[in-house]
């Protein structure tokens, strides 16, 4: 039996496990702390320790093969702060993924899975709406969590990989 993990990277992202007709959906584990800058500000970080625990639990199950598909973060040279945040999140996620036993992984671009899983012509805010609606339709057991999170990107990534 093969298992697929979809990772919608970032502090507002999520993780999903899809195995045949079983699906699990979790929001990315995060925590807030004082910013590393001198400014009086809070930053949100990925909790690699909690992510370690979740991935270890998923990888300890008796699957023949388990692979993670990590969405490559969007980089915008004009948006320095957002780019730094995306890279910090990616690094924390990679630490946990690389520590998980038996877990192979690869990077994917959002367009790869969106082209297959979402309707043609979706752009901007419509992408999240379509993700939520399609995720609820394909994975009704996860619909409450999807609606709270407002999208099902990680589930759709994992389902795209499974197909």
Which residue stretches match the model-derived regions?
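Phosphate- and other anionic-substrate recognition elements at nucleic-acid/protein interfaces
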Residues: 1-163
């Amino acid at each position: 039996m093969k298992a697929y993990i979809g990772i919608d990277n970032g502090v507002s992202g999520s993780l999903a496990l899809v195995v045949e007709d079983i699906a699990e959906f979790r929001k990315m584990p995060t925590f807030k702390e004082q910013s590393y800058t001198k400014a009086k500000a809070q930053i949100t970080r990925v909790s690699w320790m909690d992510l370690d625990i979740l991935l270890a639990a998923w990888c300890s199950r008796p699957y023949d093969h388990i692979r993670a598909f990590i969405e490559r973060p969007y980089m915008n040279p004009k948006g320095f702060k957002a780019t730094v945040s995306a890279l910090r999140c990616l690094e924390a996620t990679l630490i946990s993924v690389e520590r998980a036993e038996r877990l192979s992984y690869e990077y994917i671009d959002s367009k790869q899975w969106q082209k297959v899983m979402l309707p043609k012509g979706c752009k901007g805010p419509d992408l999240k709406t379509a993700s939520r609606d399609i995720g609820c339709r394909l994975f009704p057991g996860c619909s409450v969590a999807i609606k709270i999170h407002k999208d099902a990107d990680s589930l759709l990534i994992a389902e795209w990989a499974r197909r």
